[in-house]
């Protein structure tokens, strides 16, 4: 067997994809430098949220389901690696029209994913579309996103083969040579570079992507519902139009609601001058929570993510012999991050062989 040498890896962007890729590369014996324009982790990054839902079933897509099962498994393993509990297995419920439920359940059975049907009346504090039926995936739940990023950054900071370089803006990446140019004129070289800078990396990548901005609301349930919410599942397909999500509080987080109905295409990730109030009001009235007036609104936040301009989904692209890019994360970028990290480790291994 040929020994694999320790390769030099540069990761541009310290969001969840960047940090997990750095971690996996270090575990594989490679030397890693992580660059970010802000702090590590950066509270302004797209990944830096209180929580994100994770589920494995992709109805009608056996390969997609298989991949998410693998991602779910790796997330559980990472709790041990990082020495931090960040996964709440509370389940994920999705609302479906009655005529689609049988196909969803059959798809789950074929993939070996455990699901149960439920009557929305059993979850009275979630706003299901009229006539919808719930399907609950039991081996699913919530990732405490902020806790993940902090734990990964601590682990990387303590690893002898990893260098974290916050406040290092990258101005150019050569896809053929792997040369990375920093704002101050410094140039780094690597055997492999991953650009995972989210919306702020579009100029470095040069791939056609669409930038989206979505307003999210963080709420505190009324005292009389606090106990109910402590064991509530994450839920999707909510609201009158079936386009909303609710992620339950727990582990120091608030209740979060979001909806595609308040997602819009934008030209830049800077939203300091945008008034979130109209979007937040529209979200509050979307029917995600039947008795929303009883909840206390703690904060509204705008989140940005990119999608492939052609497919509308995620995109992991090889830009050249030495450079890969997570050009678009799609709507499930956090949950699927271990898959990207694993693919990059495979690419580094090929380079180092």
Show where each model-derived region lies.
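N-terminal Rossmann-like FAD-binding beta1-loop-alpha1 element of flavoenzymes
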Residues: 8-34
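Short hydrophobic core segments
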Residues: 10-12, 35, 187-200, 341
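Active-site substrate-recognition segment that forms the wall
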Residues: 23-27, 85-87, 199-321
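Glycine-rich FAD pyrophosphate-binding loop
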Residues: 27-47
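Dinucleotide-binding Rossmann-like beta1-alpha1 core, especially the glycine-rich loop
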Residues: 50-126, 131, 243-244
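Flavin (FAD/FMN) cofactor-binding and adjacent substrate-gating region
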Residues: 95-166, 172-174, 307-309
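Conserved beta-strand-loop-beta-strand element in the redox core of flavoprotein oxidoreductases
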Residues: 171-187
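Glycine-rich phosphate/pyrophosphate-binding beta-alpha loops
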Residues: 323-337
């Amino acid at each position: 067997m040929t020994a694999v040498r320790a390769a030099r890896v540069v990761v541009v962007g310290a969001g969840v994809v960047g940090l997990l890729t750095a971690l996996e590369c270090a575990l594989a014996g490679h030397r890693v430098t992580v660059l970010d324009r802000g702090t590590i982790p950066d509270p302004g990054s797209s990944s830096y949220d209180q929580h994100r839902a994770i589920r494995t079933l992709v109805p009608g897509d056996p390969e997609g389901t298989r991949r998410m099962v693998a991602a779910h498994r790796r997330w559980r393993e990472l709790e041990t690696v990082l020495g931090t509990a960040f996964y709440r297995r509370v389940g994920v419920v999705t609302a479906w029209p009655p005529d689609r439920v049988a196909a969803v359940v059959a798809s789950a059975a074929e993939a070996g994913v455990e699901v149960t049907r439920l009557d929305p009346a059993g979850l009275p504090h979630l706003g299901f579309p009229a006539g919808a039926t719930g399907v609950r995936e039991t081996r699913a739940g919530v990732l405490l996103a902020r806790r993940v990023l902090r734990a990964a950054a601590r682990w990387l900071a303590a690893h002898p083969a990893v260098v974290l370089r916050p406040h290092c803006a990258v101005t150019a990446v050569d896809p053929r040579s792997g040369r990375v140019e920093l704002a101050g004129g410094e140039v780094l070289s690597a055997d492999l570079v991953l650009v995972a800078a989210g919306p702020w990396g579009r100029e470095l990548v040069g791939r056609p992507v669409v930038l989206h901005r979505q307003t999210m609301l963080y709420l505190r349930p009324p005292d009389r519902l606090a106990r109910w919410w402590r064991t509530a599942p994450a839920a999707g397909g909510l609201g009158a139009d079936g386009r909303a999500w609710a992620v339950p509080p727990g582990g120091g987080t608030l209740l979060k609601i979001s909806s595609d109905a308040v997602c819009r295409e934008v030209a830049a990730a800077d939203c300091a001058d945008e008034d979130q109030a109209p979007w937040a009001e529209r979200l509050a009235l979307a029917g995600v929570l039947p008795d929303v007036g009883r909840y206390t609104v703690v904060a509204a936040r705008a989140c940005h993510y990119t999608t492939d301009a052609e497919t509308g989904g995620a995109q992991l692209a090889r830009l050249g012999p030495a450079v890969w890019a997570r050009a678009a994360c799609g709507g499930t970028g956090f949950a699927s991050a271990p898959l990207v990290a694993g693919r990059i480790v495979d690419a580094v291994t090929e380079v180092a062989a």
